[in-house]
A protein has these predicted regions:
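Positively charged, small/polar-rich N-terminal and surface patches that mediate targeting and assembly
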Residues: 1-108
Length: 108
């Protein structure tokens, strides 16, 4: 199991969500509002604030779905401009379902 964590432009969220929901067996996701900056920084003359609004997607998926989810996000979130975002794949060693108490090393 892996976590796919993506930082995307807020205006792309609905398009990304619709594309991900078309993937058979898509496990769902969490969305978090966040701010940040990367190599390309904006400079505001007044009230300097380098942080830009982003949406963070957190998806825990079985290994067999990771590549299709990753590629779907990369394709759908891309506008071709700086600041489109980043996608990471992170190893998730173990998880648990609170409602059932189920604990598994490959919990989907």
């Amino acid at each position: 199991m892996k976590e796919i964590r993506a930082y995307v432009q807020p205006h792309k969220l609905s398009q990304i969500t619709m594309a991900l929901m078309e993937i058979p067996g898509f496990p769902g996701m969490s969305i978090v509002d966040c701010e940040g900056f990367g190599r390309e920084r904006t400079e505001h003359v007044q009230d300097y604030k380098p942080f830009l609004a982003r949406k963070r997607l957190e998806i825990f998926a079985p290994d067999e779905l990771v590549e299709v989810i990753f590629e779907t996000i990369m394709r759908t979130a891309r506008s071709g401009h700086h600041g489109d975002g980043k996608v990471y794949i992170i190893e998730a060693h173990e998880g648990g379902r609170i409602s059932s108490g189920e604990r598994d090393k490959d919990l989907g």
